[in-house]
Amino acid sequence: YIPVDSPRSFDECMYILMCGTGVGFSVERENVDKLPIVNEHFEDSTTIITVADSRPGWAKALREMVAMLYVGQIPKWDVSQVRPAGARLKVMGGRASGADPLVNLFKFTIEKFKGATGRKLFPIECHDIMCKVGEVVVVGGVRRSALISLSNLNDDQMAHAKAGEWWNANGQRALANNSVAYKGKPAMETYM
């Protein structure tokens, strides 16, 4: 279980999923409110994140990406050490997905942060990044991640995260089962 209350929550989720364990996470307001404010301006950085071809290497790269985004820097990345798509995986079995899913996660995360300039990430944005992390944990085209997302009962964005044709614009949301957390028994009208 990971409360999304720290920038490290995203890379911790990635590492745990890559080790083959499912992750429950909370984007309840009481957790997300502990995140720092996203910088008001972004600029391209000359910093290059070098991604090592390992579970800790991928998680570390995401940690570095998120840390830089919080200070308004958009780094470049070097994925040349990552095994190509289709290469055999000896320890976990199956075939490598290559660097494309990780690069897509980086680009997705950059866009989410750019949409949150000067404020904290919303619970739905944190949820979407966590789901996109789950999307990366695919080996040889086979989903290897399981997620459950907990949110507040009165969070309308999370309540409607899978309403309508959500899969067209937010396909990453398919990676998590969504539920609510509450301290006391809610009134029946809440669900009507």
Functional labels for PLM-detected ranges:
Residues 1-192:
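Extended catalytic cores of very large enzyme megasubunits
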